[in-house]
Regions:
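C-terminal accessory extensions/subdomains outside the catalytic/core fold
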Residues: 749-771
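Cysteine-centered motifs
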Residues: 10-12
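Cationic, low-complexity basic patches in intrinsically disordered or flexible, solvent-exposed regions
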Residues: 19, 24
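Extended, well-ordered protein cores
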Residues: 32-299, 308-532, 536, 540-558, ...
Length: 771
């Protein structure tokens, strides 16, 4: 069987000889169904796949396991959404929709690598690249004026932000550091921690009124129904914002509003405060996942900070169609076509702002790229842990670390970061060699909470009321709004809550650690969830378990105290805190969140195994393109494969799959012990070399085991060949570095060029492919 591979996708051939199936009839169910789906994604993990997937396919063929790829990259999703614009040979299936169906099947087994959660600038960049490759994809209409353009914008919205995860996450999340990773982290603590001065001026700033937290209303519906979202203007007319949304019996639905006048006032106050305190100003949002609300909040900050520029040049900005939601970068791009004198005038006015305002935190000080250049450059779940790790500081225009006011406008989750800052100021930095762990059980199934709110988030078209009305005409929730206010509604279904509670009890039982539900009874949504948690906990045997419900600030104080004593805790949280905490604690503990084990037990019995939480690492790609060195650490992929193989073993009674799981886990331990993760420096071990060492240690473990003599006999010569040629292979891999790489594209690289770049060792390739 050969899987067809569309050109330009990070795919590798899956060749599986049908006749070999007859040799393994004792493995249980039909071999053709013993499939692991390996997602084809973007940027650094996509490049790493070219090196690692052929190895997986070669090693596991004898277990009757087929690795099949599904393209969920940004470029792939764009192409799948516009088949009518493409020639037959250019079309690809809508793999994301396929996966959305597969996650409901009990045998489904998916390795999910990080993909781009696209901002509008990234979307436009991908479209431009595809157009340059001959794909007739239309331009993205930022300000649609016709029905056709509005329809086009809605189609592109399907690939913006975190379009992938809500589709795949048909289960709740179990995230923790693998035991081997934790042992290694304590024995070899990372050295990224910087001291916390007791006189640090750094702090989190949040709104005190007018935010989502303060306005939130929530209700649980008793019976299944349909609701509509409508805007009732002060002068009477009613506009339907969303015609129909289905609610299940027992579902929780919320409505909250961000008052943009209060938001802008908050920004202005913090700008002055940062200047007076002589600290950096930084903004921390999630414009990728919260793809409707947060870019608008980001844009308001841009327009307030650069208010003098936008006021003075208002007519020019309007003519150019500058959208502040895309950041200062778009302004620079669009003024590039102005006459030199006018462009220079605007650029000079921007520099004047920097002289009169507070200093901004920088993304790249050498290039003058600030926190406000692009909405996706500073993402809260990744940025705030680094602020804390770096002693409460961020990089300034002088390329040095400085204290910062970290603006997180909404109170719902901002307070947890301020609590960590206070803890560090009082007790000093954390010690990775002794600190405990905080695992997470996260409520995320079926688009739970804020991360499923995109299609129910609206900018108020005027002054009036936005309300949620059921099909009998009953008003469930209503929120007063002013023009431009951000209205957001979230749904949380009952079955995922029941599953979440069960998973929390199971993890508490398995570990003996306290399990803390982070829920705030003063918050409308959490009050509804608390009632359900108490009800469903009563369905489980909790004798001997320490299970508590605490507001987030109390919960994080409790967890931090245990961390400093070297004790482990389970955080049981909603969807957003799941995202934030599974970056925060691993970055402090291990130096990165990419080393986390992330298991999603799908609600119908399948398994989704996510490979870390560190994003798709565009800076790694930049280094690879410049000097042929890729520093992506595939440890997340390695760790995810262990429970994936175990799932195959359980589902199909495949003993060989369990052998692969056991030996891979042993190999990961050896890999960590020998410190074979990629270096950051060119001509040293990179991603490809780390894959070689995983292959070597895994082959040696398979050769040493006696549980499966057939696999042992197969891997004895492989292990010998890899060990015998170690120096030669590493020489070939490292020797390929040190020069610019041409892979024929960024968002959709050329498959053949990338395969050559990522598999430069003929010796290694011959051993693997010869299997």
């Amino acid at each position: 069987m050969v899987f067809a591979i569309p050109d330009g996708i990070c795919y590798c051939f899956v060749a599986f000889v049908e006749s070999s199936l007859s040799q393994h009839k004792n493995l249980g169910k039909n071999m053709a169904t013993q499939k692991i789906i390996y997602t084809a994604v973007d940027e650094a993990p996509a490049l790493a796949t070219y090196s690692f997937l052929p190895l997986l396919q070669a090693y596991t063929k004898r277990a009757g396991i087929v690795f099949e790829t599904k393209d969920i990259s940004l470029a792939g999703r764009i192409l799948a959404n516009f088949p009518e614009n493409l020639a037959e040979s250019q079309r690809i299936p809508d793999y994301l929709s396929e996966l959305g169906q597969l996650v409901r099947l009990p045998e489904t087994n998916i390795i999910k690598l990080p993909n781009i959660s696209a901002s509008i600038p990234q979307l436009k960049g991908a479209i431009k690249e595809l157009q340059g490759k001959g794909y007739a994809i239309p331009d993205y209409p930022e300000e649609p004026k016709t029905d056709t353009e509005r329809e086009l914008q809605a189609r592109f919205a399907k690939v913006l932000g975190s379009a992938v995860n809500p589709v795949l996450r048909e289960g709740n999340s179990d995230r923790r550091a693998a035991a081997s990773v934790k042992r290694f982290g304590r024995k070899n603590p990372h050295k990224l921690m910087k001291p916390w001065p007791s006189d640090s001026k750094s702090q989190v700033a949040h709104m005190t009124d007018g935010d989502f937290y303060g306005s939130e209303k929530s209700v649980t519906v008793n019976n299944a129904c349909n609701v509509r979202f409508e805007f009732v203007a002060d002068n009477g007319p009613i506009t339907i914002l969303k015609e129909k949304t289905g609610l299940q019996a027992g579902e929780v639905i919320d409505a909250a509003v961000m008052n943009v006048r209060a938001l802008r006032s908050f920004y202005a106050d913090q700008i002055e405060r940062a200047k007076n305190d002589e600290v950096l100003l930084s903004l921390h949002l999630k414009a990728t996942m919260m793809k409707v609300s947060d870019p608008v909040m980001f844009g308001h900050c841009v327009s307030v900070f650069y208010q003098d520029v936008f006021t003075k040049h208002a007519e020019v900005m309007k003519e150019l169609g500058v959208n502040v939601n895309n950041g200062l970068s778009e302004l620079y791009t669009k003024i590039g076509n102005l006459p030199d004198a006018k462009r220079a005038e605007i650029e000079a006015d921007i520099q004047t702002v920097y002289k009169t305002r507070c200093e901004l935190a920088m993304v790249d000080s050498s290039k003058g790229i600030t926190n406000l250049h692009l909405p996706n450059n500073v993402i809260i779940d990744a940025s705030m842990p680094v602020v804390i790790r770096d002693g409460g500081r961020m990089w300034g225009p002088d390329d040095r670390l400085h204290d910062t006011i970290a603006m997180i406008p909404d109170r719902s989750y901002a307070t947890i970061y301020q609590t960590v800052i206070e803890d560090c100021r009082n007790h000093g930095t954390f010690d990775p060699a002794t600190m405990g762990s905080v695992a997470n059980v996260g409520l995320m199934a079926q688009k739970a909470e804020e991360y499923g709110s995109h299609d129910k988030t609206f900018m108020a078209p005027g002054n009036g009321m936005i309300r949620i009305v059921d099909d009998t005409g009953k008003i469930l929730l209503a929120q007063p709004v002013k023009k431009g206010d951000i209205f957001r509604s979230c749904q949380t279904k009952d079955a995922p809550i029941q599953d979440w509670v069960k998973l929390a009890v199971n993890r508490a039982r398995a570990t003996g650690a306290p399990a803390i539900f982070w829920l705030d009874e003063k918050r409308a949504h959490d009050k509804e969830i608390i009632a359900k948690v108490k009800r469903y906990l009563a369905n489980h045997d909790t004798n001997g378990l320490d299970i508590r419900i605490m507001p987030p600030v109390e919960a994080i104080r409790f967890s931090l105290a245990r961390i400093r004593r070297g004790e482990d805790t389970i955080s049981v949280t909603g969807n957003v805190l799941r995202d934030y905490l599974t970056d925060l604690f691993p970055i402090l503990e291990l130096g990165t969140s990419a080393k986390m084990l992330s298991i999603v037990p799908l609600m119908n019995g399948g398994g989704l195994f996510e490979t870390g939480a560190g994003g798709s690492a565009p800076k790694h790609v930049q280094q690879f393109l410049m000097e042929g060195h890729l520093r992506w650490d595939s440890l997340g992929e390695f760790c995810a494969l262990v429970p994936s193989f175990e799932h195959v073993s359980r589902t199909f009674h495949n003993e060989k799959a369990q052998v692969f799981a056991t030996t891979l886990d042993e190999a990961i331990g050896t890999f960590l012990e020998n410190q074979k993760s990629p270096s950051r420096k060119v001509h040293e071990l990179d991603t490809r070399g780390s894959h070689f060492y995983l292959a070597l240690y895994w082959a040696e473990s398979l050769a040493a085991q006696s549980r499966d003599p057939e696999l042992q006999a197969c891997f004895v010569p492989v292990a010998h060949a890899l060990r015998e040629n170690e120096a030669k292979i590493i020489g070939e891999l490292n020797g390929a570095q040190g020069q610019p790489m041409d892979i024929g594209g960024y968002f959709r690289p050329d498959r053949k060029k990338t395969a050559r770049a990522m598999r430069p060792s003929a010796t290694f390739n011959n051993i693997v492919d010869g299997m």
